[in-house]
From Swiss-Prot:
Bilayer-crossing regions: 62-82, 89-110, 297-318, 350-372, 882-902, 915-934, 965-986, 1001-1023, 1030-1050, 1069-1093
Site for Cleavage, residues: 457-458, 490-491
The family this protein is said to belong to: Belongs to the cation transport ATPase (P-type) (TC 3.A.3) family. Type IV subfamily.
Extracellular topology ranges: 83-88, 319-349, 903-914, 987-1000, 1051-1068
Cellular localization per UniProt: Cell membrane; Early endosome; Recycling endosome; Endoplasmic reticulum membrane
Protein name listed in UniProt: Phospholipid-transporting ATPase IH
Activation/inhibition comment: The flippase activity is inactivated by caspase-mediated cleavage in apoptotic cells, allowing for PS exposure on the cell surface and engulfment of apoptotic cells by macrophages. The ATPase activity is up-regulated by aminophospholipids PS and PE and down-regulated by increasing intracellular Ca2+ levels.
Gene3D superfamilies: Calcium-transporting ATPase, cytoplasmic domain N (3.40.1110.10), Calcium-transporting ATPase, cytoplasmic transduction domain A (2.70.150.10), HAD superfamily/HAD-like (3.40.50.1000)
Disorder association: Deafness, autosomal dominant, 84: A form of non-syndromic, sensorineural hearing loss. Sensorineural hearing loss results from damage to the neural receptors of the inner ear, the nerve pathways to the brain, or the area of the brain that receives sound information. DFNA84 is characterized by slowly progressive, postlingual hearing loss. Leukodystrophy, hypomyelinating, 24: An autosomal dominant disorder characterized by global developmental delay apparent in infancy, impaired intellectual development, and loss of developmental milestones and ambulation. Brain imaging shows non-progressive severe cerebral atrophy, ventriculomegaly, hypomyelinating leukodystrophy, and thinning of the corpus callosum.
Entry cofactors: Mg(2+)
Keywords (A to Z) from UniProt: ATP-binding, Cell membrane, Deafness, Disease variant, Endoplasmic reticulum, Endosome, Leukodystrophy, Lipid transport, Magnesium, Membrane, Metal-binding, Neuropathy, Non-syndromic deafness, Nucleotide-binding, Phosphoprotein, Translocase, Transmembrane, Transmembrane helix, Transport
Subunit comment: Component of a P4-ATPase flippase complex which consists of a catalytic alpha subunit ATP11A and an accessory beta subunit TMEM30A.
Residues noted as binding ATP in the record, renumbered to the chain: 414-416, 511, 553, 576, 607, 687-689, 798, 804, 828-829
Length: 1134
């Protein structure tokens, strides 16, 4: 065996620094490496077919049935249906089988149609033509036939067919522009960079002769992360190793823009592409309503088992006497007498289970799903939540949490881009204590933008002038801003000046503002060409700097750096970042003066950044290059190694100055927060900004008020006192004024709570969350939570993304288990959005990662007010009524059946006809509650927006508490007693018909069923406050349908029925005067307690919502009276 092959296998399967199991090797163009390299081992990867469908023609039926019967309710009814088939039961298998068949069939048709559409889309994608290089020539084939290692050519406006490593383009600088709108919703153009050693290959022959291998990580779904390296082989020399990152990766689904063509090598194909891996849905979130519904279901299941058990025991007690067990007309056979008693009892128990199984509402699950699915469209159709400026409307990524929007107790919000506009404007810069402002009014005149002015000392020293220019050069060079000459380019952009057509583009609005601001002060960034950055200085001379390295920004370091080389050969490292990140790394500069200015600007709500630098000698730079290269080419723990390298490089800096950028508060952000607080919701701001800046924003948006007493839990205070002492001191402060915490205080819904505000920073939070050797961490957390519960607002500053999620999780799993909502607009907010019960993304300027990973997305923060106070309120009211109503009407349905067993010797005789058993939940009572759960508005939309306190009436799952559930259950039992015994007393009078005949068993059951259908439907009509023609049509139409169906079902001889026990029954019942009287009287008696309860509660213990309803009705009557009087006076005047 070849030694190189053995060496490769040993490296691959033995442990070492690089874990080869977690990486793959790809041979570019399927070409074997030159002699001396590692042996060529062909590897098997999936083809490029995308399969987003779940089913095939062969497995649809078994797989779909398996998935549907995994649901507990469907499986339960399947068992009931099988019991009906196996043993002799009182009801036909049709009564359970038909509703189950209907539910399963409707769901299967819906899922099958959706899967058919996915098949069509997959086929269209898999069969689209793709150009690839084979033996130096351009060949065309279908996308599905692409393999890993193929070299592909993509033209402008074409979509990348798989995940590609960018090798070259027609551009001389080896760049290309892409849009990823179909992946993450971002329409801005992103720049990607070709591999340095392949960007000169512009023809098919050149690229076809490339000898290279790529080593990269195994497929993973993160769109913004990629780790790999490329080995480019030459004929004589050792391979050149270059790192590969996300900037070199072109993702499937992205589109090539403003570039004629590119060449790339396929590394991930088919279902291993990042787009395909992102098909997987997020973890399922369950709402409080769903949890309550499952708890109620368990209660009713226990009631069902109890009923069956009681009836089984009573049956055998009743039949203990021989003449009852074997009446003369129903003698048992010998085999029946010899059957095992326990087997007979178990069979009877199952028969009673079948008889009473309708107490579990199978159709409730279908109705709830339809209500959530259809209800989500009301959010997306809401014109009030459409933002004309961005052209965006609300998005619903999941409809399972609509009602959870009405239960929120804590809101965790990001600051930048969520509360603020993320539209940055450069305000000033401070250089060694000298302040420069672009727009200044001097002697009544506005100075030219390019001049600027030193607000403290207009004539700094010669050395100061050098530092000033170095500071401006640092701002011109330390960024990732691009300059485009095409005005049609999308994305955040700024024109350098009004007379030029070029635009600045960056994923960070801060960088655009800084580059634009320094341009007004005399230094203009021109472009990046052939790895040289060009700037125009104050003397209108172009300066060129070679870009050697970029140390990219990340939210943990909170800074970025560049290493550049000037035309004179001097090498500089320029670094900019947060003051907390820069100051500890500074050894020289006027730190105290700049720190004072930074703190002053922060208090005014401005965003601040500090700028520092250091000169590097050639030997230092070469050492940095080796350090960075080793970290960049690592396949395992690359991010960790890069972070360690950055720590070693970004130190011993000289402080140059600081900048101040204004980020204005969003429109109506303050009004929204004020309304949310009135609704009893606690609002926390979680931000990475410094404390002073964030606090100023909190005051501006009315989170903190002038009379709010601020409590600080920051690193600075903890340095002066121990963490234990600080926590106990704050705890005593808040408890001294607020007293013992009540249950409402804990939930954040007390209006009388002392107005405290807490400020905590990331370092202090780390100390609180950090486990201690003595196990005291838990005590610290409890103390911290106790303090937070007593504060009306909390500000968490200097937060890393994972710390935001930690805060949300801490509150989410506290002992009160409040419902949490997280809202943000950037990638650093995704972790807390996924952690919260409800995650909302703001469709902002920092991309769409937050919107993609959220449950809902809105254009602006102000739309959160209507999302919660209106939509959330309505959906909670609607679905709560739906759940309670379903259980109520099924108690009404099945309890008379239970009572009937005491009058038929526990013989399992059914009270209702098979057709009524089957259609009760499917047809007779289903549509009214569905329309109610979609249309009901117990108060007007304007009232809910105007009076946020109404939100408190439905907080903490108020309408699905056990007290309310028991009331609905008892109401159902009372109505069932009225139905049964009212009809029973009517039947005691034998003169119920004109000819003296008495009613039979089926007429008795039909009378009970008729009263029941009318009662439960009219009960819903009484609960309806918002009437439309659709409600009228469905409610009265359902009653009419029942009457017409009963007339046809009993008035026609149906040939497919073996026996027709309902023939002429309904018509005979309607021919009886007492039956008509009984229906009217029993319906009235059944509805009376609920009506009296509502009237008394409204008068004696009205809720805020009921007071508003009463006031609205009075105003409506008053306005109608005034209108009638005005009309009368008008007619009399003539």
């Amino acid at each position: 065996m070849d030694c190189s092959l053995v060496r490769t296998l040993v490296h691959r399967y033995c442990a070492g620094e690089e874990n080869w199991v977690d990486s793959r090797t790809i041979y570019v163009g399927h070409r074997e490496p030159p002699p001396g390299a590692e042996a060529y081992i062909p590897q098997r990867y999936p083809d490029n077919r995308i399969v987003s469908s779940k089913y095939t023609f062969w497995n649809f039926i078994p797989k779909n049935l398996f998935e549907q019967f995994r649901r507990v309710a469907n499986f339960y009814f399947l068992i009931i249906f099988l019991v009906q088939l196996i043993i002799d039961t009182p009801t036909s298998p049709v009564t359970s089988g038909l509703p189950l068949f209907f539910v399963i069939t409707v769901t299967a048709i819906k899922q099958g149609y959706e899967d058919w559409l996915r098949h069509k889309a997959d086929n269209a994608m898999n069969q689209c033509p793709v150009h690839f290089i084979q033996h130096g020539k351009l060949v065309r084939k279908q996308s599905r036939k692409l393999r890993v290692g193929d070299i592909v050519m993509v033209k402008e406006d074409e979509t990348f067919p798989c995940d590609l490593i960018f090798l070259s383009s027609n551009r001389g600088d080896g760049t290309c522009h892409v849009t990823t709108a179909s992946l993450d919703g971002e329409s801005s153009h992103k720049t990607h960079y070709a591999v340095q050693d392949t960007k000169g290959f512009h023809t098919e022959e050149d690229i076809g002769g490339l000898h290279a291998t790529i080593e990269c990580e195994q497929p993973q779904p993160d769109l913004y992360k990629f780790v790999g390296r490329i080995n480019v082989y030459s004929d004589l020399n050792d391979p050149v190793v270059r790192p590969l990152g996300s900037e070199n990766l072109l993702l499937r689904g992205a589109t090539l823009k403003n570039t004629e063509k590119i060449f790339g090598v396929a590394i991930y194909t088919g279902m291993e592409t990042k787009m395909a891996l992102n098909y997987q849905s997020k973890s399922q979130k369950r709402s409080a309503v769903e949890k309550s519904m499952n708890a109620f279901l368990i209660v009713y299941l226990c009631i069902l088992i109890s009923k069956a058990l009681i009836n089984t025991v009573l049956k055998y007690m009743w039949q203990s006497e021989p003449f009852r067990d074997e009446p003369w007309y129903n003698q048992k056979t010998e085999s029946e007498r010899q059957r095992n008693l326990f087997l007979k009892a178990f069979t009877d128990f199952l028969a009673f289970m079948v008889l009473f199984n309708y107490i579990i509402p199978v159709s409730m699950y279908v109705t709830v799903e339809m209500q959530k699915f259809l209800g989500s469209y009301f959010i997306t159709w809401d014109e009030d939540m459409f933002d004309e400026e961005t052209g965006e409307g609300p998005l619903v990524n999941t409809s399972d949490l609509n009602e959870e929007l009405g239960q929120v107790e804590y809101i965790f919000t990001d600051k930048t881009g969520t509360l603020t506009e993320n539209n940055m404007e450069f305000k000033e810069c401070c250089i060694e204590g000298h302040v420069y402002v672009p727009h200044v009014i001097c002697n009544g005149q506005v100075l030219p933008e390019s001049s600027g002015i030193d607000m403290i000392d207009s004539s700094p020293s010669v050395n100061g002038r050098e530092r000033e220019e170095l500071f401006f050069r640092a701002l011109c060079l330390c960024h990732t801003v691009q300059v485009k000459d095409d005005d049609s380019v999308d994305g955040p952009r700024k024109s350098p000046d009004g007379g030029k057509s070029c635009v600045y583009i960056s994923s960070s609005p801060d960088e655009v503002a800084l580059v634009e601001g320094v341009q007004r002060l005399g230094f203009t960034y021109l472009r990046l060409k052939d790895n040289y950055m060009e700037i125009l200085n104050r003397e209108n001379h172009i300066e060129r700097f070679e870009l050697l390295e970029i140390l990219s920004f990340d939210s943990v370091r909170r800074r970025m750096s560049v290493i550049v080389k000037s035309a004179t050969g001097e090498i500089y490292l320029f670094c900019k970042g947060a003051d907390s990140s820069i100051f500890p790394r500074v050894i020289e500069g006027k730190v105290d003066q700049i720190r004072a200015r930074v703190e002053r600007n922060a208090v005014e709500g401005l965003r601040t950044l500090c700028v520092a630098y250091k000169r590097l000698i050639q030997e230092e730079y070469e050492g940095i290059c080796k350090l960075l290269q080793a970290a960049k080419v690592a396949l395992q723990d690359r991010e960790k190694k890069l972070a360690e390298a950055y720590e070693q490089i970004e130190k011993d800096l000289t402080l140059l100055g600081a900048t101040a950028v204004e980020d204005r508060l969003q429109e109506k952000a303050a009004d929204t927060i004020e309304a949310l607080q009135k609704a009893g919701i606690k609002v926390w701001v979680l931000t990475g900004d410094k404390m002073e800046t964030a606090a100023a924003t909190c005051y501006a948006c009315k989170l903190f008020r002038r009379n709010t007493q601020l409590l600080e839990l920051t690193t600075k205070r903890i340095e002066e006192q121990s963490l234990h002492d600080v926590l106990f001191e704050l705890s005593k402060t808040v408890l001294r004024h607020s007293g013992s915490l009540t249950r409402d205080n804990l939930s954040g819904l007390s209006a009388d709570m002392q107005d405290y505000g807490l400020i905590i920073d990331g370092a202090a939070l780390s100390l609180i969350m950090k486990p201690r050797e003595d196990g005291s961490s838990g005590n610290y957390r409890e103390l911290f939570l106790e303090i937070c519960r007593s504060c009306s607002a909390v500000l968490c500053c200097r937060m890393a993304p994972l710390q935001k999620a930690q805060i949300v999780k801490l509150i989410k799993f506290s002992k009160e288990h409040p419902i949490t909502l997280a809202i943000g607009d950037g990638a650093n907010d995704v972790s807390m959005i996924l952690e919260a019960h409800v995650g909302i993304g703001v469709i902002g300027k920092e991309g769409r990662q937050a919107a993609r990973n959220s449950d809902y997305a809105i254009p602006k923060f102000k739309h959160l007010k209507k999302m919660l106070l209106v939509h959330g309120h309505f959906y909670y009211i609607r679905i709560s009524e739906l759940v309670q109503y379903f259980f109520y009407k099924n108690v009404c349905f099945i309890f008379p059946q239970f009572l009937y067993q005491f009058f038929c010797g526990f013989s399992q005789q059914t009270l209702y006809d098979t057709a009524y058993l089957t259609l009760y939940n499917i047809s007779f009572t289903s549509l009214p509650i569905l329309l109610y759960s979609l249309m009901e508005q117990h108060v007007g939309i304007d009232v809910l927006k105007r009076d946020p306190t109404l939100y408190r009436d439905v907080a903490k799952n108020a309408l699905l508490r056990w007290r309310v559930f028991i009331y609905w259950t008892l109401l159902g039992l009372f109505d069932a007693l009225v139905f049964f015994f009212g009809a029973y007393f009517v039947f005691e009078n034998t003169t119920v018909t004109s000819n003296g005949q008495i009613f039979g068993n089926w007429t008795f059951g039909t009378l009970v069923f008729t009263v029941m259908v009318f009662t439960v439907t009219l009960k819903l009509a009484l609960d309806t406050h918002y009437w439309t023609w659709i409600n009228h049509f469905v409610i009265w139409g359902s009653l009419l349908f029942y009457v017409v169906f009963s007339l046809l079902w009993g008035g026609v001889i149906w040939p497919f029925l073996n026996y027709q026990r309902m023939y002429y029954v309904f018509i005979q019942m309607l021919s009886s005067g007492p039956a008509w009287l009984a229906i009217v009287l029993l319906v009235t008696i059944s509805l009376l307690p609920d009506v009296l309860k509502k009237v008394l509660c409204r008068q004696l213990w009205p809720t805020a919502t009921e007071r508003v309803q009463t006031k609205s009705q009075c105003l409506s009557v008053e306005q109608s009276t005034i209108f009638m009087l005005s009309q009368t006076s008008s007619s009399l005047s003539f």
